[in-house]
Amino acid sequence: MTAGLPAWRRFAWVLGLLVAAGCSRGSGAVTPKPIEERLLKIGNAYRNAVRRLGHAPKDFQELKPSLEGDATEDLLRSPNDGETLVVIWGVDYDRLPPRPDNPYVVAAYEKKGLGGKRYVLRFPLGVKAMTDEQWKKAVFPPGYTPPP
């Protein structure tokens, strides 16, 4: 179909196809769940608060100035189970000694979760949906014991 076209027109035609394919709805982009967005917002604010304060925030009041937009305590409620999220306050996650077996440390989590999984904020910054089995193996900050 493009064999009789000059090289620049073939290039433009192929480029047009690639652009159209990249802009389609089926591009594979994943929309984060509200709980994931909420936990990431808390995680980013927590890290910013450590920089701003010079120490890890000890409670929501110290975290609040580092939050963008609406900074109400409703941010700490899980949209999945309706429970208050558990935030492990007072830990500077960037200063914890590295663990070669598992570099991720739990920083906040849903109390119950939904459908056999609870969403967990971990540092280095990320969110993971954990089964009960994964929860039992999760790494927590030194001195913190999670509920069963």
Task: Label each residue range with its predicted role.
Residues 23-90, 94-96, 114, 127-148:
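Conserved hydrophobic/amphipathic alpha-helical signal-anchor segments
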Residues 117-126:
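Active-site and channel-lining beta-strand-loop segments
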Residues 34, 100-101, 122:
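A generic fold-level signal
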Residues 96-98, 119:
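Short secondary-structure boundary/capping segments
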Residues 46, 104, 118-119:
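Small-molecule pocket liners
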Residues 1-21:
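Sec-dependent bacterial lipoprotein signal peptides
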Residues 101-107:
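Short, hydrophobic/aromatic-rich segments at coil-to-beta transitions
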Residues 110-111:
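Short, well-ordered junction/capping motifs at the entry into regular secondary structure
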